């Protein structure tokens, strides 16, 4: 046990950077958040400015301590959780990026993925990395940068350039370029990492022509990686001692550390993870096999289903369609109609993730008749989040052989009671919403705290996992299956849309 009172979690997300201070009882003392720019150079392309990621994240760290009136010497450790797969390449000497960060949602590398498939790499990638061939993962993004920034591949071979996911980039900046590391959970999302041998995979590096010299060292999710100075020169040196990709951090924050426990996070995308313990379960149903954290941050495996558009489809209603002025209004408008009037929205704006994995699917609205109004479309958009979650859960139960009795949920959209009730209805299972919604930050804080003895073990934290509300199914099985079959019909029609274009 340390005499320091607080842990800081840095939660670097897709649309904002956050810092959260927690005390020993896992209470949230203070939160600071800053949004940053989304860059869309072409349709289907998504970028961030790595310097803006760093600027927003470092300023929230200073801000959150000031807000809580806490001095840096009261902080026991810092944990980091991050948007996964997003790829950054920078100069070792200057710490300057050679290109913008290519974000996980970006589809520009679809052609590179097609070539990997043509070269017969699909099965190898599946069995070695646990992933499917898709532009979502970091490997093809790094290749794209090296292919398009002149002279960069040669510089990378000479050790002048470094690659990292967002966790690696932040730690490099926080340690003034002294530490170049990532953790197993983030490495498992690159398509360059052998999840069984726990090492970078030479065959994948060769296939994508990525020099090994630019890759970070891979470490456990809970250990001291280095120190950062808060308050400039002569400030306090604080250990950075926890790293996990956002979804694995949420799984840990929900204390799903035993085989068969699962959670679904409703953020920009929707991510369901089920802990499968020490065995890597190969999916026959389009899910990913990935690395998660055991009770001490050690390597466990998980099955994951990723849905690209969840909260992002509500933002689409607000920003592009102008049907709502605030995301919170979606619940109000959805409940003004008794159903969707036969409408299904398939929000395949950047293709579809699990279990379809079709980068060429595109968004569509089906079942429109003259009586359909904006409330029906708002409701159908919310319902699409629950339908996509059922797609993933069905695949997960088939792969694992485990029937889920309750789903733990977290993320921004779980505040929407309509969505949570519909989710329970369409799954036919209990949905449990925790009291503390910041489970991603919680996971990063737990990992950091365990590494420095702030908490001795997870047993100390079990009683803190309080369920605020439980949703139970309120519709009959026949009704549930009827609605779901309509969804399946709609999805089928949205698949493989784009590749027919000239």
Curated annotation (Swiss-Prot):
InterPro entries xrefs: ATPase_NBD (IPR043129), Carb_kinase_FGGY (IPR000577), Carb_kinase_FGGY_CS (IPR018483), FGGY_C (IPR018485), FGGY_N (IPR018484), Glycerol_kin (IPR005999)
Gene3D superfamilies: 3.30.420.40
This protein's GO CC annotations: cytosol
EC id: 2.7.1.30
Keywords, ordered alphabetically: Allosteric enzyme, ATP-binding, Glycerol metabolism, Kinase, Metal-binding, Nucleotide-binding, Transferase, Zinc
Its biological purpose: Key enzyme in the regulation of glycerol uptake and metabolism. Catalyzes the phosphorylation of glycerol to yield sn-glycerol 3-phosphate.
Tree of life domain: Bacteria
Annotated GO MF terms: ATP binding; glycerol kinase activity; metal ion binding
Residues annotated as binding ATP: 14-16, 268, 311, 315, 412
SUPFAM superfamilies registered for this protein in UniProt: Actin-like ATPase domain
Designated gene of the protein: glpK
Assembly notes: Homotetramer and homodimer (in equilibrium). Heterodimer with EIIA-Glc. Binds 1 zinc ion per glycerol kinase EIIA-Glc dimer. The zinc ion is important for dimerization.
A UniProt-annotated Pfam family: FGGY_N
A GO BP annotation: glycerol-3-phosphate metabolic process
Annotated ADP binding sites: 14, 18, 268, 311, 412, 416
Binding site for sn-glycerol 3-phosphate: 14, 84-85, 136, 246
Pathway: Polyol metabolism; glycerol degradation via glycerol kinase pathway; sn-glycerol 3-phosphate from glycerol: step 1/1
Protein name as annotated: Glycerol kinase
Family: Belongs to the FGGY kinase family.
Species of origin: Enterobacter sp. (strain 638)
